Amino acid sequence: MASLSSLVLLLAALILSPQVLANYENPPVYKPPTEKPPVYKPPVEKPPVYKPPVENPPIYKPPVEKPPVYKPPVEKPPVYKPPVEKPPVYKPPVEKPPVYKPPVEKPPVYKPPVEKPPVYKPPVEKPPVYKPPVEKPPVYKPPVEKPPVYKPPVEKPPVYKPPVEKPPVYKPPVEKPPVYKPPVEKPPVYKPPVEKPPIYKPPVEKPPVYKPPYGKPPYPKYPPTDDTHF
């Protein structure tokens, strides 16, 4: 019996080994569970079989604590609802007829003038109230230091000054008295005559040089000045 059971276990291990062990060449493909529609089976009425009551001793089963299954919250994408534009409803203007209100004429009420007699009010003389002089302690005010204000340098544009033409100043001619120089009598120096041989110079013919006629300028350098204002 033991050998038969061991043989059966070996055969089952050999048959189930490719299904139980991991196959790295052909990994298992996940197939989602298929839900088959329930097949209606009519109830089969079997005759009641008498089974004597079997009294089994009570078996203690500890309570099975299942870990809580985490279900992530399902986030539904927001559904876009386009704004509904209602067409404007035309409401005709309601014209109320004008209500006529007749003018109310009130009769004039005569009010006689009220003459009040003059009331004499004697002058009230108040005694002088003495107010002692109030001496306030001096309030210390710290000196206020103002930060220096930056003033950028002011660049003045150059002022054009036209050239000033001064009129010529008349200077009268200075007449110096003549200085008398007595004649200097030098003794005659005798120079013997030097006889130079005559040097022949061929006549040089110069071309005529054109000289334009020289005339004075039509106006003087300075305008004539009147000597009477000096």
From Swiss-Prot:
The keyword Cytoplasm does not apply. Residues 78-223 have a biased composition (Pro residues). GO terms for cellular component: extracellular region. GO terms for molecular function: structural constituent of cell wall. Keywords: Cell wall, Developmental protein, Repeat, Secreted, Signal. It is found in: Secreted, Cell wall. Sequence repeats lie at residues 27-31, 32-36, 37-41, 42-46, 47-51, 52-56, 57-61, 62-66, 67-71, 72-76, 77-81, 82-86, 87-91, 92-96, 97-101, 102-106, 107-111, 112-116, 117-121, 122-126, 127-131, 132-136, 137-141, 142-146, 147-151, 152-156, 157-161, 162-166, 167-171, 172-176, 177-181, 182-186, 187-191, 192-196, 197-201, 202-206, 207-211, 212-216, 217-221, 222-226. InterPro entries: Adhesive_plaq (IPR002964), Extensin-like (IPR003883), Proline-rich_CW_protein (IPR051308). Residues 27-226 are annotated as: 40 X 5 AA approximate tandem repeats of P-P-[VTIY]-[EYGP]-[KN]. Residues 1-22 form the signal peptide. Its main location: secreted. Pfam families: Extensin_1 (PF02095). Residues 78-230 are annotated as: Disordered. Belongs to the plant proline-rich protein superfamily. ENOD12 family. This is a developmentally regulated putative cell wall protein. This is Repetitive proline-rich cell wall protein 2. It comes from Glycine max (Soybean). The gene is PRP2.
